[in-house]
Amino acid sequence: MIKVGLNLGNSKLSCIVTDYKNSDNINILSVLNYPSNLIKKNIIINYEKLLNEVKNLIIESEKQSQTKINSINVNISIVDSLSKYYQSEIFISDQQITDLHLKKAINQSEYFGENENNYELINDIIAYDLDKKIIHTDPIGNYANKIKLYFYKLLIDKKYLKNIFNLADDLKLNIDNLIPSPLSSALSTLSKDEKSLGTICIDLGHSTTSTAIIENNKFIFGDSFLVGSSNVTNDIARGVSTTLSSAERLKTLYGSIISSPSDEHEIIEIPFISGENDKFTQINRSTINSIIKPRIEETLEIIWQNIKQNNLHNKKIKNVVITGGGSQLEGIEEYARMIFSSNVRIGKPLEFLNLKDNFYNPSYSDIIGTTFFEKD
């Protein structure tokens, strides 16, 4: 089965074409990235230009994969989304649980409630309570006096989605699934055990940072905010008065969150912000790292506070996977361990995939994960 994923990001457009057998057998036929700056904060700057860029991306993907693209999974940014938890309970007088009991509990819940301004990107049962015993598998066949269902709902603005649907219509493409971007990243980077036992997956992207929490193979929390690796680049450019391209180079080659005594003595030559070829100044490596560290600290603290606000810190999840381009900053694993008091690793696309070496890179986690998504 051919599965196609499309990502409309703030800095790039991406398309992946796969021959999908199952989650353990995926052959990647094509992965393409086009630089683009036509989407900012979930707002399309120029619809016609974006339409043309996506059209060219699809055409080139068809050529590379030798496949006709008719339908797509779309990665959806969840900036300004709303996470909501709700529950429903019924009494069944120690009967054996049937499908009808579950349907009754669902029907009397908020599951089918309409929302005028928001679209339900995720609306799922995440746990069952049978007489105060929590289970995460289908309860049918068990006996109970009282059944309680716990739900998780992720809502996003309908206006943003309307543009996505219009884009697909104009390109004559069907949308199979809309996938929260952090969930895509988690699906491509987490092992089976990590998804079962509970893991916080953090994607440090170009313009956004996104979080997904997976536990008992369920997506139980998603969040995203407008701080990314480009903010680190901007901080460096302002902090040392250099060009953005020079700041990006400094971040990539010398950036670290963990300081070393030798940083004071490592001197780096950088151009002035004017960009004149013959005008340079010198800084030491510790200056760069003193700029990077507060931004990363702030970003990780925001994630942790958002998790606490949703009372998910009580789950005491001890696994954190950091992916996305920003995850390649030296020292981020060690620093995240201190923030989250957890095991931390850098997440790359899973190794069993048929990928060229350069795609086993955290920057590709979100687009590759779009083809892993399957509705229950």
Predicted regions mapped to residue ranges:
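A conserved active-site cap/scaffold subdomain adjacent to cofactor or substrate pockets
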Residues: L226-A247
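A short, acidic, amphipathic alpha-helical segment used as a generic capping/interface helix at domain edges
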Residues: E298-Q309
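Glycine-rich phosphate-binding loops at beta-strand->alpha-helix junctions
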Residues: I258, K315-I339
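Extended, charge-rich low-complexity interaction segments
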Residues: S65, G205-E215, S365-D376
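Residue-level signature of catalytic and energy-coupling elements of molecular machines
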Residues: C15, V74, A168, D203, ...
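A short acidic Gly-Thr/Ser loop motif
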Residues: L6-K12, S77, C201-T208, I214-N217, ...
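Nucleotide/phosphate-binding catalytic cleft detector across ATP-hydrolyzing
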Residues: M1-K12, I16-T199, K218-I220, T243-L244, ...
